[in-house]
Amino acid sequence: MALEVESAFSLSYLLKENKQTSNNLFSLIQVPYTKMTHAKGKKTHLLRCILGSPFETLTKSSIRRSLKNLREVCNLPYCNFKKIPKNISYKYQNPFLKLYEINNNFINCKVGATGNTNSTYDWRNLSTIGNGWSVTSYHNDSVSRLHVSMVNNIPNSNTKKLSWWVTRVRSKNPWKRPYKVIYQRDFRDDGIKPYVSEFILYAPKNRADLEMQSILLSSVECFQDIKYALNYWTNLKFKEICNSALKRFTQTNIIITPVKPRVVSVNKAREVSSSVEVKLQRYEREGEVFVVSKAGKEDTRVLNDDNAIRNLFNATLNGGKYKLHPEAKSATGKRFKYYKDGFCWLDVFADANRRIPEWVKPHCLLTGSVLMSCGLWDFAKRKMVSVSHGLLHYDRKLERSSARAGVRDFVGASNEAVQREDFRDLDLRVEEFAERVLETANLRSDNRLIDNILTRASDYINKKSKESKELDINVCLSMDEKKMITNLFPDIQMSFNQKSYSNHGVFNAMRACENFYFSRKFKNSDYIDAGGDVVSTLRSKNHNVHICSPRLDLKDAARHIQRATVIDGLKGYGETISFCTNKTEDCAVNRDIIIAVEVYDMTLRDMAKAMLSHGSRKFEFSCIIPPEIFTKECNVELYEGRLKVTRIGDNVEYYYGSNGETFSHSCQTLKDILSVQVFQFGGRVFKKTLEHSRGQLHFFSICICEKIEPGSVKLKTYYQRSELDKVTLRIPVKDSFGVVTHYIIKEDREFVSSMIEYVANTGIKIDDKMVEWTYSQYRAKKTVTIKSGKVTQKETRIRKELIPGFIAIIMSEGIRAREKTHYLAKMLYTSHYKPSIVNIIFRLIMHFLGGTKRFIYESLVDCLKFLTNSDYIDTIVNTESRIEDLDKWFVFEQNVTITTDAEDQPSILEQSVKTFLSKYSEDVYERGDRSEFELEEFSSEQDLVDQLLNSGGGSKEDEWFYSYIFSIVRTKCTLSLAWRWTNRIFNFITSCRAKGKDFVKYIYEIIKIIINKPWEALCHYLVQGYKTVLKIPMTCVDSVNYLKRKSLEKILSYFSHERADDEYIFPGYDSDFSEESGDYGDENTELDSRSRCTVIKSKVEMLFRNIKGHIEKFLQRCGIIDQYNKIYHWFKSILTDVDCFNSVLNFITHTGCDALLAVLTGHFSIASCALKFMTDVVIEKNLSEKHHTTTKLIAGNLTQCIYKLDFIHPIWIPIRWGVKEISKIHIKKKLLNWRSTKEVTNESICKDLVHKSYIKYFDIKKAVWLLWFSLLIIFLHPTLGFFILFSIYPAIEIKRYYNNVVCFNNIKMSYPHVIDRLGGTYNFAKLKKAVREKFSENKSQGVKISEIPAEKDEDVMPPLEEVETPKRSVGRPSSKQDDIEDECNIKEDPTESLNFSNIEATSNRYDTLRVGNSKLCKFLRFYPKSKCYANIQTGDLIRDSIEEFYHLERSKLDIEISKMQRVVEIMNDTGRMLDNVRRMIDDRSMYVTLDGVSWYRLGCKDKNPAKEDFKAIFDHNFNIMEGNAKVKEFAVSSDEWRGMYSNERCRAIEQLFNDNNEMVRRPDVNGLKFYNKPPGAGKTTTIAKLMSKDLKNKVKCLALSYTKVGRLELIDKLKKDGIEKPEKYVKTYDSFLMNNDNILEIVNLYCDEVFMMHAGHFLTLLTKIAYQNGYCYGDVNQIPFINRDPYTPAYLSREFFRKQDLNYDTYTYRCPLDTCYLLSNLKDEMGNIIYAGGVKNVNEVYPTIRSLNLFGINVVGEVPVEYNAKYLTFTQDEKLNLQRHIDSQGGCRNAVSTVNEAQGCTFSEVNLVRLVQFDNPVMSDINQFVVAISRHTTTFKYFTPHSRLNDRVSNAISSLQSVSDFVLKDYHFRQCL
């Protein structure tokens, strides 16, 4: 953490900052002096004036130090300066200021400042925590206030800035100085508000405050004055550790090499003034003494001790120069001349002209913190050079250094210091070793070095992968092509996006890299692009760029059209570029730089002309030009055959890629570009330079040369040949006429050499045997390939007609090589013998004749060439060899003669330098980078290597503890052994600690189980026993009531109905067919309790019974039970009396209301409350016989004066009255649910009828309008508005109470049994309406009950509850039903049958007023006689499908009824013990209730009750009732009876058949069209688009969806298309089937996910729709119809759909490429591919290539919880377990679903989890598999147990490992242009 601090606590520091600060402080100092002038003798205290202000920054040590300085300067050794001495007062006009200056100057002299030097303190330091923060400002605003602000230098941190405000808090204790700290944390994200908090220093409230305190204290730790002011002391323990590490590091680095004497010059680094001389003198007493002689001054004697170097430096320092003697001793006692390097830090003090303080010890190496303490760190680090890790060298010759210097680094190393030889290239060795390790197949090793290298290699790879890419390559490339591009441009970080395709993609990528190279080189601005692509420039970050793009030919014109088309679609590109269609040499835009990327049509003269026209200094361009164009037979292939360059005459042809257009360029232009290096144009000389080459891609630059010396210059340029591994062969071919022609081909050098060597080795002469051997070797040398297990030979580059000539050349060359070898060997062998004189003369004659022969031969050949064809002559003459080995280099040489005029032209470089110096003339130090860098650890490179070899690559868990162990071990052994033993000790301690934790945890769990489980079981059975005892008297009472009720029912039997004839009315609402999950208790706790406490259960029960009997006997003897019974009967008599009950209720409501209002107004008093209640009781007693509510109301409000007179405001009267009455009403309603208070509450409610006359004229409708009017008045007159509001609203509630509750209870008292039977029916509504009319005085005369209009829901209420019940009607049964009734001899009851409520499940209030005629199906009405155990098919597919579906639904109802019957029987037999019922049933779909409110699920794992809503329930007599009916004993129900969907489906099917079981309505299937689309193909989107088009054209249409989720998705899409009220046109299949009895006529019908239905279900639906066109969408390969009845097969569920013609689609917008690959290759059980046309992604955004991942788990706890992921399971049990795990970890965005529930949905990330190890058919089902892997767009993760990593999903994901990326990319649709 770099700190930049301006200290404002000490005046000695602030006075040196600037004059303004000094003047301000002088004014502060002079204030006490002006006041002092009025005092006698001008004597006052000097501490405030001399030692600085304010007092908070002064410490005792600073005061003593300053007083000591004043005594020495003023020569007053015993003066305490409490008063100004007289001599000082008389001598100076302002003695306070003068004494302050004297003190300050003395301090400066003490630290080494001279009188003529103005020192500037720059207080910047590094914090001890080293966390990358930088303090930008640090000052005090007032006397006791401190402000610190810090800016974060870490780029990845979220925090931007921290600020502290430290303020001193007043304290009674003068020795305590508490400070309050307010800090603010600013974030980099502007959307996050700053975080502000405060705390007391050294007393943080939380962890955040503690962190802020640590950062604050670490930033001020280096400043003593601030530390003293804040009472902060450094952690001594931490300081000891730092000092030990520092000492160890210093010792390691000082003793590096053996001591060798050296001779140093007297002049250390600069010239030393000749006036200073240093001589060494030796004395017997004093020892060695240096005598420093200066001209004109006295000699100075310096003792040669351990401070001699420092003292000599201070004595000889003069103007930045100093002189040291070689015999001077350092702090270690070593002579200065023996130090090979070090002490460069002396130059720091010399350059600053500062003396070395006394506390500095002259070691050869000095830490940067010492220089910082001396105020020289900022000055020194500008010229620091990093020699090695932790070692710095101060170089006085540097102007600016870029080295990272830290205050913990050591300064003093020599710049020539050489690192250890074996560590010099350590990074390269590690990198090379990591590459070799990564190339191996097996990366496992027990070597710690290998593990460490692998860890670092992986970290390096991760780091490189996270680096931001500079250039995006959008064209598709293979791996070889990508490697080729990255090898050509290793300096560019590229990202390959694979978004487009080209036949020559490599060269498109190369052009992109070349453009980026030039753009980056010139900082993306201020250049001209000759022939550039304007589209690429617009898309890049370039600005102020001019593009010259002329139309030179047809290709340029076509390019312009293509680029114009792209530009028309661009948006958001506003960079400043310019464009013209002129030639570059004809354009006049001024720029200094011109670039051209692969522009081959511009000659060098054109480029020079362009430079002159644009006023440019430099022209840079790139071209692909092979040097072989200088040969006539130029035919080369570059970049592994992707580019072919051929010379044809004077043109050079370029062939890019496998297919494409040919580009032709002038050969002479390309030759000039390669060979010409200097040329002249327009009187100017231009120099072409080859900057660099990347293969045959050359980068050139052209510059204007000025001020050239005249003379001749020879320039050479060389280029490497393109094909270095080839040789040229001239192969003869003889035609049918015997004419021999020669063809030139190129062949691999190694292949040809191997063949020649073989012939030379095996052949003696040319014969048939030699030809056979040569052909055999030729066949063996050809390249072979292995494909599909077969070995095949690849064809060679030699054509078939050239093979004989090629073999002939090989044989001739081989035999000739053999002969030459034989001849030369003999010649050389004979040359070993000394020749005779005759042989010498003979050889001279032969040599002369040989030269003459050559001359005559060549002359005759030249004549023949002149007379005949020279090429043919060359072919005949060149018989030496027909194999030519090509040269490796092409060298071009140019001789240039330069002549110049005498006129001297100014230099361009001089002009640029002058411009730079005039523009940037600031001091380089002021413009330098003042930022600090992060701290680095104290360790040398040797330490790093030791750690690398011994650490093993593990992470440090406890750095402090590790360092502490190392510090102990280091004192006993060497460094290498210390690291090794420290690792072993630390690993042993860590292992013991981990094992200890596990052992303690294990013991703790055992103790916890031993203590908790028996205690929990004991408490559970004690509570159950206590509840059982309490239920004994209630059971007796219930038995008596049961007998009474039975007798009463016999008397009123004529009111009873036949339950079997009741007709149910059900609303039709949408269904997802998804099972609902309920709440679960802690199943483990229950199971453990049962398993461990079964033994003691019986004993505890027996013990409890014995204790209970003894207690009852004891209490009976003591008479306590008798007294308890008396009190209980007395209290019960009070509650059963109506008058007492009303009095108690009035006391509670009146007192509570008055107390509440008194508390709200602040006037509450217990005495006033008691007096108020007594007064009200007296008034109530006096008016008890007179029912005057108004009188009571006035009297009650008058008693409010007991609290306070201003409390009797008019608005409080209606508030008090309304609160009391409403509270009383709600309390009575609640007490009705209590068994003990139910009777007296009913009687009290009935007595309220006498008060109805007070509100008989009150109309609710008018009151509602008055309420709205009061809201308007509130804005005009608040008091009046609130008065009306609080007066009207209680009156409305009271009116409803009288109409709905009081009247009903009075009727119920007369007809209790009848009212109970009629409750909740339409007849009950009629009766209640008649009663209200009877008791109302303004009733209508002559109106029949049947003619009463429909009332609002607020006026029709069931008994005892505030639930709205709409009007109901009774429908007539069908004729077929009547026949069945006649056959069954069922007599019709004179009373109307019982009907269920028709309340729709909707949030709209007014939908509850709809009236329906839905009835129970025939199967339920005539059960069990209506059972049918078989379904007989007729041969009609449509009818058989419908009847099969009807049979399945009836079977489902039969199973549900059987389950209900069994539960009822068990409940009656077991005495309603839910635990016993659960053990016998164990069905989570079944529910039981004892009171009608709390329902208990009958699963063994479920314990907690919940509120459920059912359409039908079964009572204890197995009578089916309405879901909200009153439960007397108990009731049971199941999930099926929530909506009774099967009943509604059966009713819809029954309407299709008449009494003779004939179909009266058949579905129309002629206009249907079926479309089979794969997952993610946009089925819902297609329907939405078609419907939107129909609705806009006013065409009647309807869309049906299988699930509610699909319906909502379709509605949402229609809303986005602008369709109003789209819910009218979109329904679910069940909703439409249940709610529509009439036939709907439409034009277009759209069905979504049609294959999820049973065919009979779909056909039944079509009978209710008359359509013209039907469009059905689905996927036959996804989850089909699921038969819930395990005993009834569904043979025809999909038969109808199989008969239809399906239109198949192959496109998807959702699935990634690997998912498309799996779906395209997926086969069914018969081996047929389910998606015959495959599945391809057609999304415009390039999809994810690999998205499927596989993970093995052991338990559900190992499944990671990802907030944005969607979790799927195969079964419901897995879903519940996974949901419980996710909820325990904090939950996620989406709830867990099964695969079936997720069909049709799309998610970004999907996690499929399998928790069970046993096989389930669902998990291997192909339809489940298709849905599971096709729900995601980016990522899919499959978590399965390790033992099931071979299931279907795992095998499919694992198979993708052997599929390459380029294979997967084929499943992305690409449109060819």
Curated annotation (Swiss-Prot):
One of its GO terms (molecular function) is ATP binding. The active site is at C344, H393. InterPro entries: (+)RNA_virus_helicase_core_dom, Alphavirus-like_MT_dom, P-loop_NTPase. Residues 495-674 form the Alphavirus-like MT domain. Keywords: ATP-binding, Helicase, Hydrolase, Methyltransferase, Nucleotide-binding, Protease, Thiol protease, Transferase. It comes from the Viruses. Pfam families: Viral_helicase1, Vmethyltransf. It catalyses: ATP + H2O = ADP + phosphate + H(+). Residues 1706-1873 form the (+)RNA virus helicase C-terminal domain. GO terms for biological process: methylation; mRNA modification; proteolysis; RNA processing; viral translational frameshifting. This is Replicase polyprotein 1a. It comes from Lettuce infectious yellows virus (isolate United States/92).
